[in-house]
């Protein structure tokens, strides 16, 4: 079994892909199966959030694996009204719901109770299978070297 021990920034030839849902992309240790069927182990620094497009390598750099964000069951809220979208973010944030925030769109793990709450605000909520890339604060530190402070 090969062990993926580091995220790399420099361009390198990809030798395999690894499709993972968010609940595995937040873990520093996991047994995984690469796109080509080989088993691998994640042995990464704690607090690293993997994003689609990130690249991991073995300690010797012989293997470079590109992360693909898996399609997941998500609720999608699309709205051109920034006030309504902000209202949705506020209410979901109060419930500590991990959110992916895009221009005119929100995504969160599918939850019919939350869907119904947002529909009461006249928002359109649909179900989809899409990659889920929530804001880093919901899980761990951002993987791309920048940090957004948060204090209470």
UniProtKB/Swiss-Prot annotation:
A GO MF term: unfolded protein binding
Gene Ontology BP terms: protein folding; protein-containing complex assembly; urea metabolic process
TM region(s), chain numbering: none
Cited InterPro entries: UreE, UreE_C_dom, UreE_N, UreE_N_sf
A Pfam family it matches: UreE_C
Gene Ontology annotations for the cellular component aspect, listed alphabetically: cytoplasm
Protein's cellular compartments: Cytoplasm
Broad class of where this protein is predominantly found: cytoplasm
Presence of the UniProt keyword GTP-binding in the record: no
SMART domains: UreE_N
Keywords: Chaperone, Cytoplasm, Nickel, Nickel insertion
Domain of life according to the entry: Bacteria
Protein purpose: Involved in urease metallocenter assembly. Binds nickel. Probably functions as a nickel donor during metallocenter assembly.
Membership in a protein family: Belongs to the UreE family.
Protein name: Urease accessory protein UreE
Organism encoding this protein: Citrobacter koseri (strain ATCC BAA-895 / CDC 4225-83 / SGSC4696)
Organism lineage: Bacteria, Pseudomonadati, Pseudomonadota, Gammaproteobacteria, Enterobacterales
Gene: ureE
